[in-house]
Structure formats: structure tokens, C-alpha cells
Amino acid sequence: MLLAVDIGNTNIVFGIFETSVAGETPRLLTHFRVETRKARTEDEYAAILATLLQLHGVPFCASTDPVAIAAEGAAVQALAGESAPLQPLSVQRHERGISAGILATVVPPVLSAFQRLFRRYLHIDPVVVGPGTRTGMPILYDNPREVGADRIINAVAAYERYRSGCIVVDFGTATTFDVVTPKGEYLGGAIAPGIGISADALFHAAAKLPRVELLRPRSVIGKNTVSSMQSGLVYGYVGLVDGIVERMRAEVDFPVRVIATGGLARLLGSDSRTIEECDEFLTLTGLRIIHERELRKGLRT
């Protein structure tokens, strides 16, 4: 199975995909997230990962033992929600445990810890998304190395889905907007402060304002401090998103589809005029696609 790891400023998201088979799209079997902490060692992250894999019924390391593979097959089908009778799985179809990995990060100090984790505990040399990685997407930025890996990964996944011009809105620590041309080129985008950063700024900078949970208020017109802050944050960010997307649409000479991802995509996307689809697993899907392209690249060399 493939372990995809998206290391963000706030959270690290893990996705487990079934082993890739020619002609089939591997399913995302399960996923989980932990808080990003720069000071954690590879041993600490390994302990957390091993525990979470166990809770999700995924063995930690790969095996080619037929009995173990059959047991892993049962776990895979259970994770996928299948109720059909279990059939023996071939060694080629599923390895027991994690047999491949791919990493992407916007937090360089954490990258080295995860590389050591993969090599020491999983005995895998993971693909690291960065300059030189075969994404299959030309980058039309002034300096392509300045574009965050997560933004390119999202763009790859969105273009693979639509095969047309598209805009990706990612609600992370920062809110990013990324435009892809109908030819599958990364055109550029915009970066705004994330809604969480704005909420924290209100709490820290205004002495009488409390910290509030990010929820959709009943009304735009708040009747108390908490609902007023929630209205300003939620609807203010919906307005920000719609405003930037509409300006981007007016600036390009091709139609675009708009997809949102990130932990708050569904909360904010439901009130947006411009967001057409929300997919919280878009980045994990992009990692899986790039891993497959790297595999094909390796087979040709």
C-alpha cells in the first residue's frame, strides 16, 4: 500500500491508498491527521504513525507472506466498506502493510524527520515532491521553485479530474488560489491569510474579543459578540474567495472549474457563489497521481 503524507504548517495529513494496478484507480482506504510539531523526532512520529495505522487496521511494514496478505486483504475490503465475500488476494495485488511512500511539505524542518522515519522504520526511500519531481505539469511562474509543493499537487489533481481550465482554492493555514490552463499548465495564483490566522489575530489584538469556534452563524447580522465575529470571519472569507475567483475568471481567456479543498472547504464552500465542488482529499489524490508518474518515470530509465 502507498502512504501519502501531506505536511502542512498546522496539520500533517496521512492517506493510505491500495496498491496501484494497471487500468484501475487505487482507492483511498483510510486517512488521519496529527498536529505538526517541528521539534518532534522521527522516533516520535513513527510511534504516532504506528499507533494510528494499528487503529485503522493497517500493518506497519510490508510482507510477502501469503497468509499475511490474505489477512491484509480482509482489512482492505473492510476499510473500503465492502460486504462481498472475501477472496484470496495475489501478492501482486496487495502487499501487507506500507510498501511505498510519498511526502510533500511546506515545513522543511519536518521533512528530514519523515525521510528518516521512512528509511529506518518502513525501509522505504519515499518520493519527495519538489524541484525535479515528475509532476507532468509545466509551471509558468517567474521562479518555479517559489511555488509551494502543496499548490502544485492540488493543481495536478484538479487538472486530472477536469482536463480543463480550473481554479483550486485551498483553505489551509494560508488560503491559496491556483489557476491551471486548459493545456494543463500551472499559471499562477494568489495567497491570502487563512481564516484561522484572522481569528487568532482578532483574539490577540482586541482585548475584549474572545476566541471563537469557526462555525456558520444563523444570520449575517450577529446578535452577540460571538455570532458577530463568526459572521465576519465566515462571510468575510466567503466574500474574499468569491471576489478573487471572479477577478481571476475575468483575467483569463478560458472557462474554469472551481474546486475547493482543505479542512474548512465545506464550511466556506457551501455559501460561496463560485466554488463548484469540495474535495477534502484533493491533495492526497494529487500525491498518489505524482507517485504513479514517478514510478512510470523509473520504469523507463
Residue ranges, per PLM feature:
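Short glycine-rich phosphate-binding loop at a beta-alpha junction
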Residues: 95-107, 125-127, 254-263
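Phosphate-binding/catalytic loop of phosphoryl-transfer enzymes
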Residues: 116, 124-205, 234-245
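ATP-binding/phosphotransfer module of carbohydrate and carboxylate kinases, centering on a glycine-rich
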Residues: 1-4, 36, 40, 70-73, ...
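Phosphate/pyrophosphate-binding loops at sites that engage ATP/ADP/AMP, CoA/4′-phosphopantetheine
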Residues: 49-69, 76-82, 86-100, 121, ...
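Short, aromatic/basic amphipathic alpha-helical patches
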Residues: 113-121, 270-273
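Residue-level signal for inorganic ion chemistry
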Residues: 14, 103, 172, 202, ...
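Short glycine-aspartate micro-motif
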Residues: 2-6, 102, 166-170, 259
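Short glycine-rich, Thr/Ser-proximal phosphate-binding strand/loop in the N-terminal lobe
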Residues: 2-72, 184-211, 215-219
